[in-house]
Curated annotation (Swiss-Prot):
Positions of SURP motif repeats: 52-94, 166-208
Subunit and partners: Component of the 17S U2 SnRNP complex, a ribonucleoprotein complex that contains small nuclear RNA (snRNA) U2 and a number of specific proteins. Part of the SF3A subcomplex of the 17S U2 SnRNP complex which is composed of three subunits; SF3A3/SAP61, SF3A2/SAP62 and SF3A1/SAP114. SF3A associates with the splicing factor SF3B and a 12S RNA unit to form the mature 17S U2 small nuclear ribonucleoprotein complex (17S U2 snRNP). SF3A1 functions as a scaffold that interacts directly with both SF3A2 and SF3A3. Identified in the spliceosome 'E' complex, a precursor of the spliceosome 'A' complex.
CDD domains, per the entry: Ubl_SF3a120
Single GO MF descriptor: RNA binding
Polar residues bias locations: 509-518, 563-572
Sequence ranges assigned to domain Ubiquitin-like in this UniProt record: 707-793
Organism: Bos taurus
UniProt protein name: Splicing factor 3A subunit 1
Keywords: Acetylation, Isopeptide bond, mRNA processing, mRNA splicing, Nucleus, Phosphoprotein, Repeat, Spliceosome, Ubl conjugation
GO biological process: mRNA cis splicing, via spliceosome; mRNA splicing, via spliceosome; U2-type prespliceosome assembly
UniProt keyword Phosphoprotein present: yes
Modified residues (Phosphotyrosine): Y456, Y759
Amino acid sequence: MPAGPVQAVPPPPPAATEPKQPTEEEASSKEDSTPSKPVVGIIYPPPEVRNIVDKTASFVARNGPEFEARIRQNEINNPKFNFLNPNDPYHAYYRHKVSEFKEGKAQEPSAAIPKVMQQQQQASQQQLPQKVQAQVIQETIVPKEPPPEFEFIADPPSISAFDLDVVKLTAQFVARNGRQFLTQLMQKEQRNYQFDFLRPQHSLFNYFTKLVEQYTKILIPPKGLFTKLKKEAENPREVLDQVCYRVEWAKFQERERKKEEEEKEKERVAYAQIDWHDFVVVETVDFQPNEQGNFPPPTTPEELGARILIQERYEKFGESEEVEMEVESDEEDEKQEKAEEPPSQLDQDTQVQDMDEGSDDEEEGQKVPPPPETPMPPPLPPTPDQVIVRKDYDPKASKPLPPAPAPDEYLVSPITGEKIPASKMQEHMRIGLLDPRWLEQRDRSIREKQSDDEVYAPGLDIESSLKQLAERRTDIFGVEETAIGKKIGEEEIQKPEEKVTWDGHSGSMARTQQAAQANITLQEQIEAIHKAKGLVPEDDTKEKIGPSKPNEIPQQPPPPSSATNIPSSAPPITSVPRPPAMPPPVRTTVVSAVPVMPRPPMASVVRLPPGSVIAPMPPIIHAPRINVVPMPPSAPPIMAPRPPPMIVPTAFVPAPPVAPVPAPAPMPPVHPPPPMEDEPASKKLKTEDSLMPEEEFLRRNKGPVSIKVQVPNMQDKTEWKLNGQVLVFTLPLTDQVSVIKVKIHEATGMPAGKQKLQYEGIFIKDSNSLAYYNMANGAVIHLALKERGGRKK
């Protein structure tokens, strides 16, 4: 603390005038003698501190001691107000001034300078002209509050001109239409990278928000803005005053910055002048083994850090007791949580179970005993008998590691039966119990070991393996040589075939197809191809889909070798409806594979006209092991176009010798079957090609039409009203489909971008009108949810 001399006279006047000053003042007036007289026993502060003390004393005298307590609380860290403390040397002067102001003897302090300096300043100010005095007064003004920031200035970021225009235009629309427009825009353009600045974590979001505020102030100006602008337009002097104040504030900030830099420089120079390495060892203290000292108990780094924080908080706020109570409460909470945790037992069941990964924590919870509820008392200071002083102790040396378990300590795993090191047993148990199929893996590994290495098999396995060997090698252990190898392949374990399933991801599609094709043999592929082509007769024992004739008797096809001896009354292999003008069939010769078409019906059996003779064909070369079945040269008019000859393996269609077929006789004219009746209009799906032109439809139909919209029932979309209701709208035919979507949005809340409309099998587009799709009165439109990224179903 600054110390001042205890004196009866202030220091400024010289020694010759000291005894004369009080006598002159007493002669002038007795009333002013009391405040001007120096008091013996009071330390007078320096002029700059005296001004603060006098002002504070005047305020405290007027407002009471509550004001003093408020100043002491607000300025607790300000050293200029240390005179408020009772232990400060200037506190007596402060109390003296407070009593003088209460009695009305003291005057309000004008400045913290001596009287001689005040008289000189008054004389000089009287001599100066008025303009200079005004300048001096203006220079002493210090701005208190910063000027208001510019509301319509925002530095644009370094982006392209197009992106800047997008941000500005979006901000203008948001300022005009409100926050609801911003929410809808974010939902609609959430996948558009051009509008990423709408997200709060984007770098342009602050600039966008500033633009919205500026546009909002322009479109919806505050109440006093017009009055302020009108006043500034009529009185330019006010604008100049604002500019001058802003300039003075900039100068003040610059002076403050320079002052801080000068203080830092002074502090740096003061630190540089200290020779930190210039020290002298005064004394070395050696502690003897039998010496007993009153030292505090040892602390941990955590406790030391907590003590430092408590001390700093006490110096700052004076809340040491509350902090200690908070620390104790935290420790008690942790102890209660640990005590409430029940000790869990490790499940030793060998069945397949889904184990949690927290098994290690549970085991540790078993081994570690719960902490005691009562806090442990602090350790007592060590006694001389217990203290061991080590002279070679190095606190920086690394602590010795705990002894590792011996490498030859192995434990048998209860899961796999393998020998596991003791250090890795816990990790092995955790990993083994994570897999619920460890039993299958264990059995499979045991079987593989038994089949690979028979040397280490137990006694019963040796007996069974010898029996298997005797059954396979009867030339050694028996008398029949024909039984050699009869058991080969029979002892193979019949493993259940794992079905290949697809998980639904596009990345695993090719891998799943390869896995499914790996289990299919070549024979199964050939059979599947011939079943699809119709070359193989279907099994009548299997259940067929679709209606069948009640009087139809399924018959097996005759062998190919007796095809020439079939009587004329034998029915064909497959019969189809035919017109009445068709002549009766004579013989069945060739089976043709005709693909199934929707209409007209096609025949699967080729019949020859009467009078034709079947001659034997030359033998077919068997090198490629395939038979080519040729088609007849002509066919009845009811048959479909002739397909190419089918290539059939010999295992399914043997090729008997057949004579070449001569040209048949001219067939009588056959009338085609009557066409099938058209399907009803409700079952037909329209296409855009079948629609009537828009102009012609408008000429035929005039006036508005009533349209029904079938809304789906989607309970998971709670934000939309999709309860399966039917919406009815009356619209003119010239309106576009987008008008319907807007009305659906108003009724259900479903955005137009999420709507998918279908009318009679056609997905209608927004840009086309109702007349384009030939919508009549009472047309029904089905509403569905548009799935982004997927194909239209």
